[in-house]
Amino acid sequence: MSEYQNILTGVQVRTAPHSAPIAKGIFPRLGKPGFSYWLGKIGDAQIGPIYLGTTGVLSLVFGFFAIEIIGFNLLASVNWSPMEFGRQFFWLGLEPPAAEYGLGFAPLAEGGWWQIAGFFLTTSILLWWVRMYRRARALKMGTHTAWAFASAIFLFLSLGFIRPLLMGNFSESVPFGIFPHLEWTNSFSLNYGNFFYNPFHMLSIAFLYGSALLSAMHGATILAVSRLGGDREVEQITDRGTAAERAALFWRWTMGFNATMESIHRWAWWFAVLCTFTGAIGILLTGTVVDNWFEWGVKHGLAPAP
């Protein structure tokens, strides 16, 4: 007889492949459903079938072109050498146009490729959001996931499009590349007087750490009471059993307060959404409303006077 271990488990549920019915469309489900032993170790073992739909296919097409444009530009920057491309990959970048071009179209070699890649990437992401929203509606689900993703997209657009638009030139945007992106982040903070004194950045970090803490607390709690039926959270929301009661009692003993089986998910959702949303607000205020966050902090008693 298999023994259930709720950290590492050897028990995997295998049934006939299942999926919810969907209305007939242009694109049918793709692939024959199967099972993966290793995926079953961390999640549902079933793989497929996959439904992309019109927006899903278009999103992948636009995303492919964006990656190709970025990739070929990075390769061209090392004289088309695969060896150098692999060696310097983390340092390579595709830079936005210089400030002299403003919001206009720049020559390809001077930021034009960045603009084209940004258009394709943004279109791909927005189409994927539409796909998520429409799939949720088709399955008669709530659209919570789509709106959480929209918050992340808002931060993405604030960095690459909305703030540069407010500043009057695309040179304020973020380059494509790993270390170039990190260098931009560092320079951005230095140019505007230490971004750490931006209160919306503080809120964003608080929600980021809070999201990690809430996820750890919730995950640990459910695993701790799963042997008592705590994994059936939906049932425990409307008809609390011993698992929900014990979990609630544990947290009241620990910190004097407990969430419910329903409210913990709402807390986690809001913390995750507000992490990127407040981050985007902080980005949009930088350079447009506040030129130096350290001086702003000194003026409002947030930073020590020099």
Curated annotation (Swiss-Prot):
It is found in: Cellular chromatophore membrane. Keywords: Bacteriochlorophyll, Chlorophyll, Chromophore, Electron transport, Iron, Magnesium, Membrane, Metal-binding, Photosynthesis, Reaction center, Transmembrane, Transmembrane helix, Transport. A ubiquinone binds at W251. Pfam families: Photo_RC (PF00124). Gene3D superfamilies: Photosystem II protein D1-like. InterPro entries: Photo_II_D1/D2_sf (IPR036854), Photo_RC_L/M (IPR000484), Photo_RC_L/M_CS (IPR055265), Photo_RC_M (IPR005781). Coiled coil: none annotated. The chain crosses the membrane at residues 53-79, 111-140, 143-168, 198-226, 260-286. It comes from the Bacteria. One of its GO terms (cellular component) is plasma membrane-derived chromatophore membrane. GO terms for biological process: photosynthetic electron transport in photosystem II. GO terms for molecular function: bacteriochlorophyll binding; electron transporter, transferring electrons within the cyclic electron transport pathway of photosynthesis activity; metal ion binding. It is a multi-pass membrane protein. Its main location: membrane. (7R,8Z)-bacteriochlorophyll b binds at H181, H201. PROSITE patterns: REACTION_CENTER. Fe cation binds at H218, E233, H265. The reaction center is a membrane-bound complex that mediates the initial photochemical event in the electron transfer process of photosynthesis. Belongs to the reaction center PufL/M/PsbA/D family. Reaction center is composed of four bacteriochlorophylls, two bacteriopheophytins, two ubiquinones, one iron, and three highly hydrophobic polypeptide chains (designated L, M, and H). This is Reaction center protein M chain.
